[in-house]
């Protein structure tokens, strides 16, 4: 599951590429922490029982992660208070904290809605203006990252806009970060100059990224089993999640003709579901090696509509 930049301490693009065992190509560059939370979201979400650590480490091995790195990642997520560790004799398990569960539930809501249906827009814009002293560069970076995650784009320096009704949310987020001077409004915009308000986003670049993912989905047709199915499915999910940080969810009226968001969502959902039975069987195998009774808890998640 994708992580909010300010709530997880995990950069969307950090980490090294991990080759999925048996997969036809490597998972794209992504942090190991993101891979772990994606496994929780896709296979153990809404399960109150903690997941055996050995099963997690095994699944992470399917994604190309060596055991020492996998265990170090679990320890890091515990320090970030996204996972909690339990010990019962020699057995160790990991479960989501309330904070980790909230992040996954937020991501689940996004997955259920983004690209599923056309976006209805009332023509108004959320506008955020803020001022942060140049000396506080770390705060400036965090504030901008958070606004991008919420779907805002920079119209001018210190002026960010979004067609979604998220002005109040943005104000609350920035004040919580410690931004001292924030003004928000919801209003009509009359922007002079070429491109209009849409120039706040790199729509050409986002369109190219959709094209890359379309080619990946077209190439992903093999009937995979075992580790290869789990790795392929996780890689596709992580690639789709990345669009949350680059596609602001603009309505059709603001987009170029034939914007591919809904088409790609449909392709992704179908392929994700096709890989589901084999990937879930692999995850159950990892869990059953430690505790056969817990294998029933592996989630059967489907995205197609």
Q: Which residues make up each language-model segment?
A:
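Short alpha-helical segments that sit at the start of domains
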Residues: 2-6, 10-42, 102
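Short acidic, hydrophobic short linear motifs in intrinsically disordered regions
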Residues: 47-59
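Short, hydrophobic-biased segments on the C-terminal half of alpha helices
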Residues: 71-75, 92, 144
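Glycine-centered, phosphate/nucleic-acid-interacting loop/turn motifs that mediate DNA/RNA or nucleotide
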Residues: 81
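Short, Lys/Arg-rich nucleic-acid/phosphate-binding segment
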Residues: 87-93
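Short, amphipathic alpha-helical interaction segments positioned at domain boundaries
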Residues: 101-125
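Mid-protein regulatory/catalytic core that forms ligand/cofactor-binding pockets
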Residues: 133-223
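C-terminal regulatory/effector modules of DNA-binding transcriptional regulators
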Residues: 197-305
């Amino acid at each position: 599951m994708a992580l909010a930049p300010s709530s997880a301490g995990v950069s969307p693009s950090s980490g090294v590429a991990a080759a999925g065992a048996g997969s036809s190509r490597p998972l794209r560059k992504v942090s190991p922490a993101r891979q772990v939370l994606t496994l929780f979201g896709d296979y153990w979400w809404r399960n109150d029982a903690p997941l055996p650590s050995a099963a997690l480490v095994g699944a992470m091995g399917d994604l190309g992660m060596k055991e020492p790195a996998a265990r170090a990642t679990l320890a890091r997520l515990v320090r970030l208070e996204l996972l909690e560790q339990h010990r019962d004799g020699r057995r160790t398990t990991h479960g989501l904290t309330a904070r980790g569960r909230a992040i996954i539930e937020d991501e689940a809501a996004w997955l259920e809605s983004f690209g599923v249906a056309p976006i209805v827009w009332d023509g108004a814009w959320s506008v955020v203006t803020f001022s942060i002293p140049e000396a506080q560069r770390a705060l400036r970076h965090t504030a901008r990252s958070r606004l991008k995650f919420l779907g805002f784009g920079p119209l001018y320096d210190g002026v960010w806009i979004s067609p979604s009704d998220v002005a109040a949310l943005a104000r609350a987020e920035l004040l919580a970060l410690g931004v001292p001077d924030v003004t928000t409004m919801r209003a009509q915009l009359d922007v002079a100059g070429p491109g209009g308000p849409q120039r706040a986003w790199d729509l050409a670049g986002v369109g190219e990224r959709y094209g890359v993912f379309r080619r990946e989905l077209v190439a992903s047709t093999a009937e995979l089993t075992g580790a290869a199915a789990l790795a392929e499915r996780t890689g596709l999910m992580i690639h789709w999640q990345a669009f949350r940080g680059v596609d602001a969810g603009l309505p059709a009226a603001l987009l170029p003709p034939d914007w591919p968001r809904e088409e790609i969502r449909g392709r992704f959902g179908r392929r994700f579901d096709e890989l589901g039975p084999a990937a879930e069987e692999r995850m159950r195998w990892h869990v059953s090696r430690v505790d056969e009774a817990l294998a029933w808890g592996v989630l059967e998640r489907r995205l197609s509509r």
